[in-house]
Each structure stands twice: as structure tokens, then as C-alpha cells.
Amino acid sequence: MKPLLALVGRPNVGKSTLFNRILRQRSAIVDPTPGVTRDRHIAEGEWQGKQFKLMDTGGYNTDGDVLSKAMLEQTLHALADADSILFITDARAGLSYEDLELARILQRSFQHKQLFFVVNKVESPQLVIEAESFIKTGFTTPYFVSAKDGSGVADLLDDVLEALPEAPEGEVKGDTAVHLAIVGRPNVGKSSFVNALLGTNRHIVSNIPGTTRDAIDSRLMRNQQEYLLIDTAGLRKRTKIDAGIEYYSSLRSERAIERCEVAIVMLDAEQGIEKQDLKIINMAIERKKGVLLLVNKWDLIEKDSKTSIRYEEQLRMAMGNLSYVPVLFVSAMTKKNLYRALDTALQISRNRSQNVSTSQLNKFLEQTLAQVHPATKSGRELKIKYMTQLKSAWPVFGFFCNDPLLVQSNFRKFLENKLREAYNFEGVPISLRFLHKNKVKED
């Protein structure tokens, strides 16, 4: 298993900038607003041939508001998972009460871990002199760095990774987990859903829209199958996204969909489906991901024996031609249908990766063409010789014909519907490609 390094410190000391410097990419959200990294964010890195995971925690502070207390709890929870802890302070801002308090917590509760004291933003000789006073924290060997220009970071990484024990050979294997992205508008219950599955308050849960700003990965094992759950910031309409934090969070959610096999799109039962929900669903469909629609907070709805039927009918009308997307009614609060949702997502993942033999497909084609013959176009008749499944991450079927330009949209839709009737592609977009002389016409 790759060692986990955690960055911790009060808000705005430069943890996310250092995170990005170490990974050499813009991964964590960076903004001068204190507390931008509210929850933990983990990414993989490599230095001098050594692989590791780096975790950017929420900023530590002693404010009394509900969200700050939740951030503190999450920070301590995150540190318990780490192999090494990098305690970050700010040379320009000077030592604060929060710095001293956090130093005491680290020395008292995490003395069994590798602790590294980092003074960031040391970008002049004068700041080096002033930073000497930081030994008041009790850490006598500070590392003076500048995450902004990179000075001192290499020496820090050398020492941090040198102090870690060597990972046993062959322990790092290919990821066989099913990748699920939990996406939706803010405050529909995505983090509550993940926490209920994990059985732990692993993500900050608050009724403040947009509490989970970054995409966060968690792993879950069920019935000998591992799942990677990617909990994301809620996707807002672009007009509601501020130039800084919300913009980057929305991009992160879109990237989470690109990483997943199945997008679990969550709705609020009381709010119903909106244009932004349809946009999220279509975003996943366009990227050829599996899709599962969850209606959360179902426990809050007054209902009779036909409520769910009527509700689903309204959803189907709004979704139009996405009849293959399954709908489940769940409650993260009461845990209604949570594991059924997970099992359904697994089945969708399997549907997405299934392969149908060429012999089966051509038998299917023969039977289908016997039912309905393609209409002529400009006096010419479409003739399909055979079909096969093409190699792809999602189901793609190639139809070899005399002229792809003769294929009409209604016949294409007919073939797709027949394929769905014959094989289980629930929750999965499928592509039909009509081929002639190595030229491809895609749907």
C-alpha cells in the first residue's frame, strides 16, 4: 500500500499550493479565501522513484461555527489515516493561537507518527530570521519552504520519504474497484449517502449548499467487490458559479464523471428534477458512462401505494428518450435502498463492460431484419451484411453495410431498441457505427 502523507494547518497557510507543488499539477482548489479546502482531498504522487498518496486536509481553526467544528473533526479523522503529517504554518502571517493549539494537538495525539514542521512562504532572508521564532511550537527542526516558487520543497520531500518504511514489493496492484461518481446539485444528500454506506462520518455533512467543494475518494468492500466512491461538489448552474471556488468545484465534478464507470445522479425528492439535473445526466451520457438516478430523502415525502409510480412517470417524461436509465427511491437518513443502489450500480457497470459474441449478434441481426426491413433512401436500399461488437470501454456495435449514408435515424433507433430488448444494457448508453470500406459514421 502506498504511504499516505497529510498536509495540515490553519486556513490560508498555503496547504493547497504546496499540495499542487508536490504533485506538479493543479489538483486541489487554490484561492486566497480562508478555508477553501474544506474537506480532505487525496491524490497520488511520485518523488525520486518513490510513490505515495498526498492528502490536503481542511483548514484547522478555532471558530465556534458549526462548519468550523465539522472541519476540525474531519481534520483529526484524516490525520488518523496518515503515515506522515506535514504541519504547515505561514511565515508572513506569523505564529498564531491556532498554530500553537494545533502543535499541541499533534504532539499529544499523533506523536507515534512521523511529524514534519513546515514554515511556508519563506521568500526572503528577513522572513528566514523571523521564522526562527516558530520553535515556540515545540518543533525544533523547521523546514523553511516556499510553495509558491518551490524553494526548500525538494529537501522536505527527500526527508519525508526517507523516513517512511519501504512498501513490500508486489503490494501495489491494478485497481479492480468499480468506480462510482456521486453527483448532483448542492445539498441533495450526496455526502450523507456516502457516509451511510461507509458507516462513518467521513465527509462534512451540512445543510449549507456546496459544503463538499472537492471530489473525495472513499473505498468500500461489499460481497467481495470493492467500490471507489467519488463524492463531488454539487454542480450549480454556471450563472450561480463564482469566479473562484465554485468554478473550480464544478470542473472537479465534471472530471469526476470522466473518471467513473457509473455516475450516480442524486435528486432531492422534495425538489424534483430540474434542468441542471438533466444537464448532469446528459453530461454522463455524452461521456458514455453508466447512469443510475437516485431520488433521495424519500422518507420526507407523504405517499400512498402509487406515489413512487406517479413520481417515476414524471421523471420519465422529463428525461425523454433516456428510458434505459434506472430510477431508485432512497433515503440516506433511514438507509432505505442504499445497498440496493450499490448492487444496481454494480450491475450497470457489468452491463457496460459485457461482450456479446459475433455469432450471437448476427443471429440477432438476421431475426431483426426479418421483422423490419430498412426503408429505401433516394431509391437505394440499405443492405447490412453482418455486425460485431467493437472494442471499447462501453458497448459499441459495428454494422457493415453497402453505404452508411443510407442509414435513417428511425431505423437506427429501432436497432438500438431491439439490442436493448435482446441484451441487458440497463443504465448504459450504447453506440451504433455503420461501416463501409473502413469509414465510420458514429451516432
Swiss-Prot record:
Protein residues bound to GTP 1: 9-16, 56-60, 120-123
PANTHER family: GTPASE DER
UniProt keywords, alphabetically: GTP-binding, Nucleotide-binding, Repeat, Ribosome biogenesis
InterPro entries: AAA+_ATPase, G_ENGA, GTP-bd, GTPase_Der, KH_dom-like, KH_dom-like_a/b, P-loop_NTPase, Small_GTP-bd
Stretches assigned to the EngA-type G domain: 3-168, 178-353
Organism, scientific name: Chlorobium chlorochromatii (strain CaD3)
Database matches in PROSITE patterns: G_ENGA (PS51712)
CDD domains xrefs: EngA1, EngA2
Superkingdom of origin organism: Bacteria
Family designation: Belongs to the TRAFAC class TrmE-Era-EngA-EngB-Septin-like GTPase superfamily. EngA (Der) GTPase family.
Annotated SUPFAM superfamilies: P-loop containing nucleoside triphosphate hydrolases
Protein name: GTPase Der
Gene: der
One record GO biological process: ribosome biogenesis
Annotated GTP 2 binding sites: 184-191, 231-235, 296-299
Ranges where the KH-like domain occurs: 354-438
Matching HAMAP family: GTPase_Der
